[in-house]
Amino acid sequence: MLSRVVLSAAATAAPCLKNAAALGPGVLQATRAFHTGQPRLAPLPPLPEYGGKVRLGLIPEEFFQFLYPKTGVTGPYVLGTGLSLYFLSKEIYVITPETFSTISVVGLIVYVIKKYGASFGEFIDKLNEEKIAQLEEVKQSSMKQIQDAIDMEKAQQALVQKRHYLFDVQRNNIALALEVTYRERLHKAYKEVKNRLDYHISVQNMMRRKEEEHMIDWVEKHVVKSISVQQEKETIAKCIEDLKLLAKKAQAQPIM
């Protein structure tokens, strides 16, 4: 069985090793795709997880299938028995005490395999499953880290692709700052002009008021100067008469 496994593995790996003769192992590892595509058969070929069927614990099933068309169903057994008797009769193989020791040891090995082989195989499979689980956990952790790195790289690339928006925002901020400065200076100029206009208006109003007061004083002085003593006496007498007349009218009216 072991020889058949070795031969099948060698036959499987022969084309890959033939093509990889001119390359080093590092190059072969570098050319292998990471988690994508079909796995390469170099530098190590895949080994079968379970062996083929055997009879008598040693003879491959393919040997019997090869002899069945030529010798029939009992042909392999007859051939094996005949060869054994031929080797014994011709003394090609001589039975010695070591032969019985070998038979005893082989029988003991077969008994141990039949008795404890299943439980031992389950124990080995359990250890293998634990190792596979650990390796799978490491693999998933590595894949997660790589995926996180890929997502971060994509996010960074997206930010790089949108960097022109940042320039537009900065350009708009500068334009807004210039507009605010322009508006502030315009408002300041408006206030300065308004204050100056208010000052000129106040000056004009004050000058007009002073001119009016001066005109009134001037007219009053000249009017008073133009009134003679006789006119003043006549005016006073006229006022007294008017007051007396008003007093009589007030006395003549009945009290309500």
Curated annotation (Swiss-Prot):
Coiled coil, from the record: none
GO molecular function list: proton-transporting ATP synthase activity, rotational mechanism
GO biological process terms on file: proton motive force-driven mitochondrial ATP synthesis
The entry's keywords: Acetylation, CF(0), Hydrogen ion transport, Ion transport, Membrane, Mitochondrion, Mitochondrion inner membrane, Transit peptide, Transport
Annotated Pfam families: Mt_ATP-synt_B
Entry keyword annotation includes Acetylation: yes
Residues of the transit peptide: 1-42
SUPFAM superfamilies in the record: ATP synthase B chain-like
Subunit record text: Component of the ATP synthase complex composed at least of ATP5F1A/subunit alpha, ATP5F1B/subunit beta, ATP5MC1/subunit c (homooctomer), MT-ATP6/subunit a, MT-ATP8/subunit 8, ATP5ME/subunit e, ATP5MF/subunit f, ATP5MG/subunit g, ATP5MK/subunit k, ATP5MJ/subunit j, ATP5F1C/subunit gamma, ATP5F1D/subunit delta, ATP5F1E/subunit epsilon, ATP5PF/subunit F6, ATP5PB/subunit b, ATP5PD/subunit d, ATP5PO/subunit OSCP.
Protein name (Swiss-Prot/TrEMBL): ATP synthase peripheral stalk subunit b, mitochondrial
Species, as recorded: Mus musculus
